[in-house]
Structure formats: C-alpha cells, structure tokens
C-alpha cells in the first residue's frame, strides 16, 4: 500500500514490546509495506473511530411515561390546566 502524505509528518520515536514488533514485522512483510506505515495506519484508524456516546449510559435509567420527551415543559414546569 502506497500512502501519499499531503500534510506534514512529524518524526516520532516510540518504545514497543518485542512480541508486538515481531507481529508488526510479519504483517508489514505480508502487506509489502513498512512497519512505520502500518503504525500510522493503525493509529489514524483508531483515532477516527468515534467513542461511545455518554448519553447512551442514561438510556433506560429513568422511569416515567413513554411520552415524557413530548411534554418536557409539563414535566419540568408542571402541568398547566
């Protein structure tokens, strides 16, 4: 895989476990690319993935009528008859 970089790249030195380095070398050989290119790809892919939405933690946490969102003013300010 040939990756063309339009933006500037920054040199970065990292420490990596030997077993991960070996696995990276095998995968780089298999894909006919460099270990550095694989690392750039993996990091970019990981950072592009959206994290979990914190609002999802609240789903199902509250008890009430099914249409509360339709009458939010009534719930917050009380019903005006």
From Swiss-Prot:
Cross-referenced InterPro entries: CopG (IPR002145)
Keywords of the record: DNA-binding, Toxin-antitoxin system
UniProt record, GO biological process: regulation of DNA-templated transcription
Regions crossing the membrane: none
Keyword hit for DNA-binding: yes
Gene Ontology molecular functions: DNA binding
Role: Antitoxin component of a type II toxin-antitoxin (TA) system. Neutralizes the toxic effect of cognate toxin VapC20.
The protein, known as: Antitoxin VapB20
Organism: Mycobacterium tuberculosis (strain CDC 1551 / Oshkosh)
Record gene name: vapB20
């Amino acid at each position: 895989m040939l990756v063309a970089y339009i933006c500037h790249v920054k040199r970065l030195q990292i420490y990596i476990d030997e077993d991960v380095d070996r696995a990276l070398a095998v995968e780089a050989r298999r894909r006919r690319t460099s270990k550095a290119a694989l690392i750039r790809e993996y990091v970019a892919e990981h950072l592009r993935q959206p994290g979990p939405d914190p609002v999802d933690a609240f789903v199902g946490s509250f008890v009430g009528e099914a249409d509360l969102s339709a009458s939010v003013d009534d719930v917050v300010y009380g019903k005006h008859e």
